[in-house]
């Protein structure tokens, strides 16, 4: 089976492990985008600690789950989002206002939509988490 997206596979593995009540999940292969996405999720408390394991191939990540995650997903293709359009995307993707985050990749790094609005940067939409 061919991989559509490494990030999509990682978030799908996290979703499935969370639904089945697992305490941790192994993600492979690893990438910088996955690590930055997980850092944003960890900052907002959706996941616990995660550890990168270098196996001299593509790497692995072990993520500790804490049961707070409802859903996370990838938006494909990665649409360009202007600062004014962020509100429309949050309304479409998230179940309610003030609940969940849309994660963007910007010139200032990978961040959630609130941080992007504060820093006044726009970019491409990666995914969502709530």
Curated annotation (Swiss-Prot):
PROSITE patterns noted in UniProt: RIBOSOMAL_S8
Gene Ontology CC: ribonucleoprotein complex; ribosome
InterPro entries attached to this UniProt entry: Ribosomal_uS8, Ribosomal_uS8_CS, Ribosomal_uS8_sf
UniProt superkingdom: Eukaryota
SUPFAM superfamilies according to UniProt: Ribosomal protein S8
Molecular-function GO term, any one: structural constituent of ribosome
GO BP, one annotated term: translation
Family indicated by similarity: Belongs to the universal ribosomal protein uS8 family.
NCBIfam families: PRK04034.1
Name of the protein in its database record: Small ribosomal subunit protein uS8
Species of the source: Candida glabrata (strain ATCC 2001 / BCRC 20586 / JCM 3761 / NBRC 0622 / NRRL Y-65 / CBS 138) (Yeast)
Native organism taxonomy: Eukaryota, Fungi, Dikarya, Ascomycota, Saccharomycotina
């Amino acid at each position: 089976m061919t991989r559509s997206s490494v990030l999509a596979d990682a978030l799908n593995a996290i979703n499935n492990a969370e639904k089945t009540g697992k305490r941790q999940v192994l993600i492979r292969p690893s990438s910088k985008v996955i690590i930055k996405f997980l850092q944003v999720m960890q900052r907002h408390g959706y996941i616990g600690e995660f550890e990168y394991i270098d196996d001299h191939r593509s790497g692995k990540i072990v993520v500790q789950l804490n049961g707070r995650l409802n859903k996370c997903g990838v938006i494909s293709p990665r649409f360009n989002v202007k600062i004014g359009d962020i509100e429309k995307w949050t309304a479409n993707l998230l179940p309610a206002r003030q609940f969940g985050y849309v994660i963007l990749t910007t010139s200032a790094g990978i961040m959630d939509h609130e941080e992007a609005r504060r820093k006044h940067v726009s970019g491409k939409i990666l995914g969502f988490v709530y």
